[in-house]
Amino acid sequence: ELVEYLCAALEKEKLFVWGGSWGTELGTYLCFRYPEHIAGYVGSGQLVNGVLNEELSYDFAMDEAKKAGDTKAVSTLERIGRPVDGCYREVFKGMMAQRRIMKKYGGHSMNKGTYWTDTALPLLRSREFSFTDKLGLALGYKRCLTYMWPTTSKCDFPRECTRFAMPYYIFQGAHDNNTPSALVQAYYDAIEAPDKDLIW
């Protein structure tokens, strides 16, 4: 309905869809299930398989922490445990703990900043959002991940979505271990589309 509304409002027959990280799950399902008004898809930080994604991301964080002799990080990862069916025991807390360690060792980007310095602090300093907006974003993010992640982690695109009626493009970081690049190449190879490209 939203795509049809936007096409009418913008007086366009078709729109391009862009998804980043979790948005690649939404975008891929949208393009696969409702291709009529989609001109093309562009994804970055492409999700491929929710369960394998989390397992590989956890393993990367654990391996890097062990190599660095970071006993505190290893202990944290052992405490939260390897994800089961793509989810940590304490969904939000476990995921955030793993993501902090994964990011610390360059698994999110080559910038080894923290979520605090790279995400939270710039948001807090932003003049574009009110205090209420910022609080709502933080609480909404936590609530959203806590309740939606068990469903989100069930996606398996190589099994569910490989044939597309529109061009399908992926921009992926070669060192990405948040949405592991190790899964992306095999998925890309399986995709059938009028045009496709994987840009590293």
Language-model region placement:
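A catalytic-pocket lid/entrance helix-loop region that shapes and gates access to the active site
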Residues: 25-84
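Alpha/beta-hydrolase
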Residues: 62-159, 166
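Short beta-strand/loop motif that positions the catalytic acidic residue
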Residues: 164, 170-172, 176
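Conserved alpha/beta-hydrolase "acid-adjacent" motif
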Residues: 177-183
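Catalytic histidine neighborhood in serine/cysteine hydrolases
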Residues: 189-200
